Structure formats: structure tokens, C-alpha cells
Design a protein with these regions (language model features):
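Bacterial N-terminal signal peptides
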Residues: 1-4
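N-terminal helix-cap/turn-to-beta initiation motif at the start of protein domains
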Residues: 9-23
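A short, compositionally biased
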Residues: 20, 68-70, 115-116
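Central antiparallel beta-sheet cores of small beta-barrel/beta-sandwich binding domains
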Residues: 27-102
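Periodic aromatic/glycine/histidine/acidic cluster detector
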Residues: 33-36, 109, 121
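Aromatic-rich beta-strand edge motifs centered on tyrosine
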Residues: 36-40, 66, 111-115, 137-139
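Edge beta-strand at a domain terminus
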Residues: 83, 88, 93, 113-143
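Charged, amphipathic alpha-helical segments
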Residues: 104-107
Length: 143
């Protein structure tokens, strides 16, 4: 599998993330982590993520994959706050790496399909040290 910089010949689109549409769920210790993604339409995919611990939502995030200015970008809004732009840095058919080196943390957001699993990762420098958090999820029925 080739993984390289995004080239002008075959720019990825939101259609390449179609496999992500639907509902995903995993565990982080005692917490349940969920992401729900729409099907691609209008050069955009809309998503919602939340983490529930002890029957309480402890974090949530509105998200988009959007084609902007000829580039695919990941646009999260943690806790419903200000939107942050992470342009696509590199991709393959099953792995998409979005990067914003000017963001505090994370600087990279990675979505990867591994067989039937979704592995979503955030990584970068935090307090002067490299940090990586991985969220492994399975596709579940949307309610």
C-alpha cells in the first residue's frame, strides 16, 4: 500500500471516506467512545463524537470532512467551540492523515480502517513531549 504526500494528480475527496459513514463505538477504560458520520454529500461529511463515562457525557465534538480550496480537510469543533482546520497531509485508500502544526494539541488527526475496525488517533507535542491517543472502534447499528 502506497502512503505518500497528496499529489495534484489524484486528490482525495470526501467520497474516498465513504467507508467511514455510519456509527462507530469503542471503549477507553470505563468510557464509551462513539462517532457518527453522515454519507458524503455536497463535498462534505458531517460527524458527531462523544465520550460517555458513568452515564454522563464527558466530552463531545462536532466534526466535518470538507473539500475546501481544492483540498480535503478535517474540521473539528471540540465541545462545540471554535472550529480548527486540519488539511489533509497524506493518504492511502484506508488511511487519512490530517495535520495542523500550529495547533496546540493535537497536531495530527489520523483516521485508519484496519479490516472491520476504525482506528482514530490524535498525536503531537503536548507539554514538550510527544503524545498519542488511539481510539479503536467497531461499526455498530445506528439508533
Amino acid at each position: 500500500m502506497f502512503l505518500g504526500p497528496v499529489s495534484g494528480q489524484s486528490k482525495p475527496t470526501v467520497e474516498d471516506l465513504f467507508w467511514l459513514s455510519g456509527c462507530w463505538q469503542g471503549r477507553q477504560g470505563t468510557a464509551v467512545v462513539e462517532e457518527m458520520w453522515s454519507k458524503p454529500a455536497g463535498s462534505t461529511m458531517l460527524g458527531l463524537g462523544r465520550t460517555v463515562r458513568n452515564n454522563r457525557t464527558v466530552s463531545f465534538e462536532f466534526m466535518q470532512f470538507r473539500e475546501q480550496d481544492g483540498t480535503l480537510a478535517f474540521l473539528p469543533q471540540p465541545q462545540g467551540g471554535a472550529q480548527v482546520k486540519f488539511p489533509l497531509k497524506e493518504s492511502s485508500s484506508a488511511r487519512f492523515v490530517f495535520e495542523n502544526l500550529n495547533h496546540d494539541f493535537p497536531q495530527r488527526v489520523i483516521y485508519e480502517r484496519k479490516n472491520s475496525l476504525l482506528v482514530a488517533s490524535i498525536e503531537g507535542t503536548q507539554n514538550g513531549k510527544f503524545s498519542r491517543h488511539e481510539f479503536v472502534m467497531r461499526k455498530v447499528r445506528c439508533n
